[in-house]
Amino acid sequence: MLALAAAPLLVCSAATADDALPDANRILDRLEALELRQKALERELAERDARIRELERRARGREATAGRQLEELPVSPNEEPGTTGATRSAYALNAGPRTPPAVDSGSEPSSYGVFQPGGQGFKLVDTPQGDLNFSAWAYVRYLNQQDLDDSYVDAFGRERTIDQRNDFQLNKINLYFKGWLFDPAFRYNFYTWTSNANQGDPASVVIAGNLSYQFSPELDVGMGIGGLPGTRSLRGTFPFWNKVDNRTIADEFFRPSYTSGLWAAGTFENNLNYRVMIGNNLSQVGINADQLDDELNTISGALWWTPQGEYGPAGGYGDFEHHEEPVTTFGVHFTHSREDRQTQPGTEAIENAQLRLSDGTLLFQPGAFATDGQVNRATYRMMAVDGGYKHRGWSLEGEYYWRAMDNFSTVGDVPVNDLFDHGFQLQLGSMLLPRKLQAYAAGSKIFGEYGNPWDLAVGLNWYPNERRLFRVNTEMLYLNDSPVGYASVPFALGGNGMVLHTNVELMF
């Protein structure tokens, strides 16, 4: 009886087990499908992470490229303002492929007519085929040189008159039209550049530009008018200087200048940056093509490292940004050029990177050494090393220069076969009021074969709206036998004594 009673139960249990098997199989199938899908998602996430890392790497390179090309508002025709590869900051104007989107806090984004902060200017056009941006830089200067001696005597006993000045000048104006076309990696930069203190002189107004293409963060190639990167001030740091559009006399004395040529620049993931350029001569401003030789042997290069990954906008001077942690920069530069007296600009040329003796005498002028001889050709070689430190509004920055000139081609009696000079500059800055008021001191000295000139300046920068690109500057400058000087800078050739100048500088 019990067996008969249990039989139906066993039959039901067996049937239930048979029914459960398909369900278990379906669950296993679903688990396997979910496992496969999870693996696919993991692969997709890994690929996406790899793409993000690559985009971040490219973005770092683009910000680096921007500094080499787009934030340096040049003292003479060169490239426009940008952030150096070391900075990777928000100040980059056309950071690589495309100009950053316009910013307008008070309205919806627009494709044109919008002001872009940080020196980017106004976005005039923004289309899938390219964009166009307009920016400008200018400053007004009051200059008083009445405390200078009215004459000086050079190393050969020749007395020369100094034209003391006391005037106002709208000293320089730069107008920029820049952007990209067809391919975001292909960029153009066209500009007009004026030096109103030199009105009437050759090349007081220049219309020029350059073209560039970024193949990768490590390789950006350009051609046109550019600065030979022979010193830090020609490495894309302008206008982020303590001074307003003038260097120490040592930097001015040793440096190369601006010329037409071809360059390559790049930045690497270890925060190492480079720029190398081959050009026509040391300074092409005011020089026509017929005056150039056919050797094309002017070459200049710079290699610099920012261990912390950035050194402020454009890698410039001073710590306006108030770095909470210390940042540093280290660089080395070299320039070589075979110069002809016809390829050197005139004495009062706007950017007269002249080859001079340390008493200010032009190397190529007739009778330079108080003889009947003249140097017609010479080889210029210059090396510079620089370093900088910034922390909490303080900055200390220096540079040392070595320059050799030899292999002279002469006519008549020239008593020397070569020249060697060296020197240094130091700049100390402190933000007395964060983003409002900066004090600085800058000095330099040249150890030369025909004199040891030096200069010392102290100045104040006031930023009325707490923006670095608009400031009022006042500087007291003491000169001792200045070997350099021309109309657009505050120092006078041969100057001895005190100079006062006040500047109002604006860049947008």
Per-region residue spans from a language model:
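Bacterial N-terminal signal peptides
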Residues: 2-11
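N-terminal periplasmic/intermembrane-space "pro-region" immediately following the signal or transit peptide
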Residues: 15-139, 146-149, 271, 305, ...
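Residues at secondary-structure transition points
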Residues: 22-25, 165, 378
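N-terminal amphipathic/basic helix or basic patch
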Residues: 26-29, 298, 499
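Outer-membrane beta-barrel pore domains
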Residues: 107, 323-508
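A short catalytic or substrate-binding loop motif that flags glycine-/basic-rich loops and adjacent residues
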Residues: 115, 255-256, 378-379
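Outer membrane beta-barrel
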Residues: 119-284, 291-311, 317-340, 420, ...
